[in-house]
């Protein structure tokens, strides 16, 4: 058969059509992929994956993280800061079990605060758990909370028979029991009231050590006693988170190698109900720390081991021996509960005792307690200036407004205290009347003052159904002792580190002079980033919670630019007309946002 020879130009046409087909197919493929990514969950998933890759890179590459911080500070980061992974819903940076498990077990060092450097931390916003709801309002929250807000069933499963808490439909309920009082904290407190003046205002501040879900502290509120409960992050998962969700004052802490972050002679009552603190270990170091914190004339209550406990005769004998060495008065031993009263005046500590206890010399500051190693010496009452014993300070509520002697011993302390009280009465009235801040609302229960000084802001709220965590920055004058003498509570803290609480635990955060919290004392330079501080504030603030910041117009303009990045809506207002200075007031509200479904 013959062959037809086509011209060269004709022979090339099939190849040209094949190339055109490829280009056309590629174009339609790109269009199809665009619509898939835009309108299907696959696109969301890939976008989320990309965001998380970027998020992880900010932690692994400090330079990229710093670039992002700089953009946010300048208001040039147009999108909100990315959300953290779903598994971070209960994340506490300084109490991270994965990080801390590598540390020494000696004296529970690994369960204390150990904070990562900012450059080691992803810059992201902690999400709420799936199904999160605005918390049950106070006082109903004392007895029930939403299960979805903290879907951790371990305590209810293990401790339900002891009356700690139960799962009932959408709620966790709190019958008010505990390991040492399964019949309810009310009955237990009635027993203590036979020996301790729980009524009448003699006792005001209490510390509940190893508190469970804080039913003891919650019940004491009806007696006018303000108990701060603490426990470490532990195997029960989120004891303190449950306490705070209920609206009970609480704080994450561990009595390990360091002093607890409170000044000397803060508490009128200290309580341990099966807290399992080995008070006599390490030459009674932990009992000595309790003694530092307990006000002279105050009461120490220990229920549970080793008090008349089977097979713990030696531990019980040692506990009694330490109390005798410190001249504590034995008030009662009632079953497995012992009650002691601390002596007033100079310690009668003998020169010879079986634990080798000695008085601290004058070089040991009694109230320094920020990363301060525990001392194996007993605080001298004479080393703490002012009147601070029960019986010499006023009863509650008079002590709230009377000038504490520990304020008077400061330079110009009397005048400064009285001026501070007037200033905050005026400011809070302006907040309520002119700025319409509803501080008496049932939705506001847990309040924080990040820069409390003498506690003037908290004092004006004393008649409201709120409690205030007064924070004294560790690098500022240590005035927390004055706050406790007033019958209020608080802690020392450095705001260049995360706070020891769970996410979403405060309804209202107040700060006067936010930039001063991160500035170096000897220069105008910052010790850390305002962006990181605002991300931390967002972590501990509940959705729909409010932030009030007082500072200069320049600082507040900067904060307002960053507020968008942490998903807050904000507005700036003039200060009250009676106040001097240039400061203004920023009010911000945290939005309730949720993770995309593909992020779980």
Curated annotation (Swiss-Prot):
Record keyword Methyltransferase present: yes
GO MF term (any one): S-adenosylmethionine-dependent methyltransferase activity
Membrane topology: Single-pass type II membrane protein
Cytoplasmic side: 1-18
UniProt entry keywords in alphabetical sequence: Glycoprotein, Golgi apparatus, Membrane, Methyltransferase, Signal-anchor, Transferase, Transmembrane, Transmembrane helix
Any one GO cellular component localisation term in the record: membrane
The keyword Membrane appears for this protein: yes
The organism's place on the tree of life at top rank: Eukaryota
Tissue specificity: Highly expressed and abundant in suspension-cultured cells, but low levels in seedlings.
Involved pathway(s): Glycan metabolism; pectin biosynthesis
Biological process (GO), any one: cell wall pectin metabolic process
Transmembrane segments: 19-39
Pfam families registered for this protein in UniProt: Methyltransf_29
Record's subcellular location: Golgi apparatus membrane
Family label: Belongs to the methyltransferase superfamily.
Record's protein name: Probable pectin methyltransferase QUA3
Species: Arabidopsis thaliana
Gene: QUA3
């Amino acid at each position: 058969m013959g062959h037809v020879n086509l011209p060269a130009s004709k022979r090339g046409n099939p190849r040209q059509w094949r190339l055109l087909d490829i280009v056309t197919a590629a174009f339609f493929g790109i269009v199809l992929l665009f619509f898939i990514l835009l309108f299907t969950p696959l696109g969301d998933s890939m976008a989320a994956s990309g965001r998380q890759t970027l998020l992880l890179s900010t932690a692994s590459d400090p330079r990229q993280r710093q670039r992002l911080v700089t953009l946010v500070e300048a208001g040039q980061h147009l999108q909100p800061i990315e959300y953290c992974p779903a598994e971070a819903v209960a994340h506490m940076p300084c109490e991270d079990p994965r990080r801390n498990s590598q540390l020494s077990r000696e004296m529970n060092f690994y369960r204390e605060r150990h904070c990562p450097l900012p450059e080691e931390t992803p810059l992201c916003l902690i999400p709420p758990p799936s199904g999160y709801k605005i918390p049950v309002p106070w006082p109903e929250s004392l007895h029930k909370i939403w299960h979805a807000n903290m879907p951790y069933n371990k305590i209810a499963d293990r401790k339900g028979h002891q009356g700690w808490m139960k799962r009932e439909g959408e709620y966790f309920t709190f019958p008010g029991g505990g390991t040492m009082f399964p019949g309810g904290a009310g009955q237990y407190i009635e027993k203590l009231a036979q020996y301790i003046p729980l009524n009448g205002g003699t006792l005001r501040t209490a510390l509940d050590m190893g508190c469970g879900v804080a039913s003891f502290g919650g019940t004491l509120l009806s007696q006018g006693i303000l108990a701060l409960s603490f426990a470490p992050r532990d195997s029960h998962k989120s004891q303190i988170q449950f306490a705070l969700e209920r609206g009970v004052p609480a704080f994450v802490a561990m009595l390990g190698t360091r002093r607890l972050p409170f000044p000397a002679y803060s508490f009128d009552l200290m309580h341990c109900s099966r807290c399992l603190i080995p008070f006599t270990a390490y030459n009674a170091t932990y009992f000595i720390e309790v003694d530092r914190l307990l006000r002279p004339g105050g009461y120490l209550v220990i229920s549970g081991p080793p008090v008349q406990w089977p097979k713990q005769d030696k531990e019980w004998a040692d506990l009694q021996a330490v109390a005798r060495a410190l001249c504590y008065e034995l008030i009662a031993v009632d079953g497995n509960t012992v009650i002691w009263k601390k002596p007033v005046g100079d310690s009668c500590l003998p020169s010879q005792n079986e634990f080798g206890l000695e008085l601290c010399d004058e070089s040991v500051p009694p109230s320094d307690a920020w990363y301060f190693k525990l001392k194996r010496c007993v605080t001298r009452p004479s080393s703490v200036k002012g009147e601070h014993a029960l019986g010499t300070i006023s009863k509650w509520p008079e002590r709230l407004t009377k000038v504490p002697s520990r304020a008077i011993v400061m330079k110009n302390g009397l005048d400064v205290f009285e001026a501070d009280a007037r200033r905050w009465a005026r400011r809070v009235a302006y907040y309520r009347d002119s700025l319409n801040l509803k501080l008496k609302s049932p939705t506001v229960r847990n309040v924080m003052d990040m820069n409390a000084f003498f506690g003037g802001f908290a004092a004006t709220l004393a008649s409201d159904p709120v409690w205030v965590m007064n924070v004294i920055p560790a690098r500022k004058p240590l005035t927390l002792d004055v706050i406790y003498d007033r019958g209020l509570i608080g802690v020392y803290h450095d705001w260049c580190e995360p706070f020891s609480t769970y996410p979403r635990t405060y309804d209202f955060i107040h700060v006067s002079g936010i930039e001063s919290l991160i500035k170096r004392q000897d220069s105008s330079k910052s010790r850390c980033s305002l962006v990181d501080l605002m991300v931390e504030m967002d972590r501990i603030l509940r959705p729909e919670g409010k932030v009030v910041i007082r500072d200069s117009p320049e600082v507040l303009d900067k904060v307002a630019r960053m507020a968008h990045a942490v998903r807050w809506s904000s507005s700036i207002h003039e200060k009250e007309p009676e106040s001097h200075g240039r400061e203004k007031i920023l009010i911000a509200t945290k939005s309730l946002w949720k993770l995309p479904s593909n992020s779980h």
